[in-house]
Amino acid sequence: MKKNNQESLSVIGHAIVSSNFCIADSQGNMPEELKSEVDWKMFQSDLDNSDLVILGRKSFEKYQSSKRFRLVATASLSSFLKQEEIIFFNPNDISIKQILTTLDLCPKKIAIAGGRLVYELVFKDLFYTEFHLSIKTNFIMPNGVPVLNRVENITQFIQRMRENNMIQSQELVLDKDTIQLRFVRV
């Protein structure tokens, strides 16, 4: 990875949510109804064009075969463990910034693939330059896992973005049941 300073770092969050802003069902699984082929292709393209992907353990376990350079948040170890293209880390022991500094990693583009704890961690430890939020307008997940703490609707999501110096910049229609809202840092 090339050296860079924080001003040129791009950190893009990606999430697809139900109309009540959940990313998973009550068991922590992503139901088929939450998927959008157009969103998936856009998401995969952005991950492919990123220097580093940050994700949680559940997402990693589901998509282990990826050849992308990944930083995986997990509570199952102390500090961090580097293995070729994967770095496992315990966010209770070491921050994202500390890992990047300790391992002399200087990505220009970081993609955030979730889940909720990872999204929150980036707000706490780093920052977002963009957030791409896809919404399945025809699907509700009662008792699901919210995308962010204390966010159950668009008003609360927009407020959370504003609190972190982000505003909505674009709205795209991905398919008949899915829109994507893009937020940028101001």
What are the residue ranges of the model-derived segments?
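Enzymes that bind and transform nitrogen-containing heteroaromatic metabolites
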Residues: M1-V186
